[in-house]
């Protein structure tokens, strides 16, 4: 059985880890970094860039550089959050035919899971390069407060990337696994405060240890799927735009290029202000008007940044209170507080959390890597590599159906341990009713329309009977991924209807299969491109070496040989301008053949030089030959 890798698919950055024996190891990507920016760019010449290369070219290609896509995954276009992003993002957010929030790039409609799949493919490739074998299975993390549609969309992204998603687990739970696995923690109750690039979660988790077996039980979870570092950046960007407008009378919001430069500078300034009291946002030639170029140079203090984002930090405190209340605990019952997510490096966030819990958060958990490590641990549990670990997670939101009068009737309440199954008997609302519509909802509001609609289906063929007499048994079954399966059964006739909830939006099977095929086709195109580049590089190398040898040979080489070699070099240079790999290879081979005489001369010269060297280099008696042993890196 191959490795089940652990992937933290983040809003801002993503990370991949594997189990290496009993320890989880975070893997470095092809750029040598342990985290990869969750950024995808589509270039003018049709290339798809992922991670750091995409981030580097964002300034010159803002409309086709996609970031923070996790905030849109599994969302409807009309959702308040999607509408908010539509107004501030440099790329185009559109409504898909089914009402989902999609993106438009270079005239093409793309679903968020397709874009996230590009990041997952890079994570998959990173693991394959390290392991030296194909990877087909993964555990992927999601914010604890993700609803069913968002979880399903994340699973779809995994499939499009060529991964079988063995489990979807919640990010705070993964962080708790990373914290608790290698520490002798005994029995503890911990709070995981996870403020990432786009989402916020709080989970209260109990770790019990009995005879060496550790049980991680989530007691309660809460959060906000549209609160994170991106919002902090936006506040600083807006402030800088307004200051520049006051100073220069120009609104940078109309200039996508300037806004992309400003976004990068704001993120950098925010990070610097975690360790410094003030910083300068210095952007020469940010824009220009009739009078010439304009420069931005604005001083930002830590106090200023804190005043801009204080309400965002405060917004994270209310869910802490609710989570503690749901767990039936008080602040004094929490033994350890763990901070996860890059935004928790901000001193103000750390102080607010410390003030709330009355204790300093732990600093021995890496906020960028803990979630991926936990996902790898869960992968190890599923593959049997990790023993003596039991994980009991919960569903973050109540699940129910719409009943008479537009009321939401919960069947499974929030913070119920999963997997779980619950049935309830309902009846008809009218005489001789022959069909019922089961409308499945997720949320905490009493009025059905105020909750998230997960989908609906009909149960027909009900025997005619007076109102209230028919017995319809509705069963909700949540699997370990937190994904819902619903069935409705007429107890009188035994007639049954079942569905796995796919949000009334979401991708259908046909769309997913098409995206999987497209991804495979792209992988083939990428492989061919890589081979072409290698062939070109070899040809370049040969041209350079041949020219050098021609110079060194001088008049010793017969004129006809020299002409033949120069003609072959020119032919190869012409072939290099094409995209034809076979043509480049043929011309490379032709050059190798005609330059045989040149190679012969070079070898003779080298041999002559070597003989001369031997006569002069007598071995000293007091020099000892060093013994060495080649040590190969263990991969």
Curated annotation (Swiss-Prot):
Residues 602-635 are annotated as: Disordered. The modification Phosphothreonine is found at residue 199. The keyword Chaperone applies. Keywords: ATP-binding, Chaperone, Nucleotide-binding, Phosphoprotein, Stress response. Disulfide bonds: none annotated. One of its GO terms (molecular function) is ATP binding. It comes from the Bacteria. It holds the Pfam family HSP70. InterPro entries: ATPase_NBD, Chaperone_DnaK, Heat_shock_70_CS, HSP70_C_sf, HSP70_peptide-bd_sf, Hsp_70_fam. Induction: By stress conditions e.g. heat shock. Belongs to the heat shock protein 70 family. Acts as a chaperone. This is Chaperone protein DnaK. It comes from Yersinia enterocolitica serotype O:8 / biotype 1B (strain NCTC 13174 / 8081). The lineage of its organism: Bacteria, Pseudomonadati, Pseudomonadota, Gammaproteobacteria, Enterobacterales.
């Amino acid at each position: 059985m191959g490795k089940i890798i652990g992937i933290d698919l983040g809003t801002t950055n993503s990370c991949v880890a594997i189990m290496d024996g009993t320890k989880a190891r975070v893997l470095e990507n092809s750029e040598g970094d342990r985290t990869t920016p969750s950024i995808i760019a589509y270039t003018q010449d049709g290339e798809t860039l992922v991670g750091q290369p995409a981030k580097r070219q964002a300034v010159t290609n803002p409309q086709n550089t996609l970031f923070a896509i996790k905030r849109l995954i599994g969302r409807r276009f009309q959702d308040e959050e999607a509408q908010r992003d539509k107004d501030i993002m440099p790329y185009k957010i559109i409504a898909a035919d089914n009402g989902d929030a999609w993106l438009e790039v270079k005239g093409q409609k793309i679903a968020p899971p397709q874009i996230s799949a590009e990041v997952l493919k890079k994570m998959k490739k990173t693991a394959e390069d390290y392991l030296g074998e194909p990877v087909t299975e993964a555990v992927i993390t999601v914010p604890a407060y993700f609803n069913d549609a968002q979880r399903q969309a994340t699973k779809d992204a995994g499939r499009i990337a060529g991964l079988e998603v063995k489990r979807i687990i919640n990010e705070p739970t993964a962080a708790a696994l990373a914290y608790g696995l290698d520490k002798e923690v005994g029995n503890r109750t911990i709070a995981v405060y996870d403020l990432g690039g786009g989402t916020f979660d709080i989970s209260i988790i109990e770790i019990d240890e009995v005879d060496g077996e550790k049980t991680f039980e989530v007691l309660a979870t809460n959060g906000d799927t549209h609160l994170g570092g991106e919002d902090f950046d936006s506040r600083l960007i807006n402030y800088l735009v307004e200051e520049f407008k006051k100073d220069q009378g120009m609104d940078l919001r109309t200039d996508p290029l300037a806004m992309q430069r400003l976004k990068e500078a704001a993120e950098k300034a925010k990070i610097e202000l975690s360790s410094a009291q003030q910083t300068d946002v210095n952007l020469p030639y940010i824009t220009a008007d009739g009078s010439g170029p304009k420069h931005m140079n604005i001083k930002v203090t830590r106090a200023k940044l804190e005043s801009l984002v204080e309400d965002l930090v405060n917004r994270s405190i209310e869910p802490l209170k609710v989570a503690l209340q749901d767990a039936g605990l008080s602040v004094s019952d929490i033994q350890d507080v763990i901070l996860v997510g890059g935004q928790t490096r901000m001193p103000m966030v750390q102080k607010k959390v410390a003030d709330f819990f009355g204790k300093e958060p732990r600093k021995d958990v890496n906020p960028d890597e803990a979630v991926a490590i936990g996902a790898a641990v869960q992968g190890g549990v599923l593959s049997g590599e990790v023993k003596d670990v039991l994980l009991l997670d919960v569903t973050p939101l109540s699940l129910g159906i719409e009943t008479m009068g537009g009321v939401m009737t919960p069947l499974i309440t929030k913070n119920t341990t999963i997997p779980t199954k619950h049935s309830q008997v309902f009846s008809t609302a009218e005489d001789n009713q022959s069909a019922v519509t089961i409308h499945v909802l997720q949320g905490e509001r009493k009025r059905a329309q105020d909750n998230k609609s997960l989908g609906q289906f009909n149960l027909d063929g009900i025997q005619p009977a007076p109102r209230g007499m028919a017995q319809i048994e509705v069963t909700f079954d949540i699997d370990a991924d937190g994904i819902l399966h619903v069935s409705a059964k007429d107890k009188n006739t035994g007639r049954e209807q079942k569905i796995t909830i796919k949000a009334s939006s979401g991708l259908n099977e046909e769309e997913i299969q098409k995206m999987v095929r497209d991804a495979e086709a792209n992988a083939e195109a990428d492989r061919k491109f890589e081979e072409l580049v290698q062939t070109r590089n070899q040809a370049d190398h040969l041209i350079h070496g041949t020219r050098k040898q021609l110079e060194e040979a001088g008049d010793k080489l017969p004129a006809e040989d020299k002409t033949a070699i120069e003609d072959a070099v020119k032919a190869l240079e012409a072939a290099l301008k094409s995209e034809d790999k076979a043509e480049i290879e043929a011309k490379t081979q032709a050059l190798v053949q005609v330059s045989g005489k040149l190679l012969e001369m070079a070898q003779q010269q080298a041999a002559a030089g070597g003989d001369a060297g031997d006569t002069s280099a007598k071995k000293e008696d007091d020099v000892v030959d060093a013994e060495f042993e080649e040590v190969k890196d263990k991969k």
